[in-house]
């Protein structure tokens, strides 16, 4: 009985103490803001007293951010984006951290970090493609040595789902235009994968133009690509990403080390559609899928 009373007293003491979190965002773009809202709302909904300090690397000097965080000594740092993750790893790695919206976590995180990747399971993407238009059966993609694992995952999933896959490895960036032309000439759907070596402004523009020219449905990585001319983009729900990160931070508040908390995948997925592109591709999107879309572009244009 005495032991139980002591444990209960310790729990109440921890629960009543105010926890603190520093939030470092790589920029002030809307997706980052949505994730921050989700992170804050997690604790608000649980009636937890958490003090927050926010920093955006868009408009604040990195030296000042690091200095203030060192002075505040928060219980956890919530980091959004690769730039913020790199800063946290190099200069404030002694404080437990939770990350999200980092394309390649292995390159910028350390043992004192955990978080949520942006890696949406391939099976979810392929099933969504089939829902949008069952006629899309020939899938194309480009990959590099850095995204080889993702290519192999997609190849396995395509085989399991009876989809044909045409893929090409990119060694030199100068090979990208010809590779796009070659692949889009023999597929009806092109799946973009996270790989900064392949996808940058000029290559994305070239892909979207070739997609329309060859009536190939381009599947993008976020609504940015849909607005620019992709048929659809399957994306994370950023507010829910923040919520998931809040759950990880809660466990750190409770005494768990980030090294004991597995990096997780997104739980909630959303997608955006471009109706004008769909019309040009001859794809008639079912009304129920239009209703489910988080954003629709190309209406009335």
Where are these regions (language model features)?
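Bacterial N-terminal signal peptides
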Residues: 2-11
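Short hydrophobic alpha-helices and adjacent helix-cap/hinge residues
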Residues: 17-301
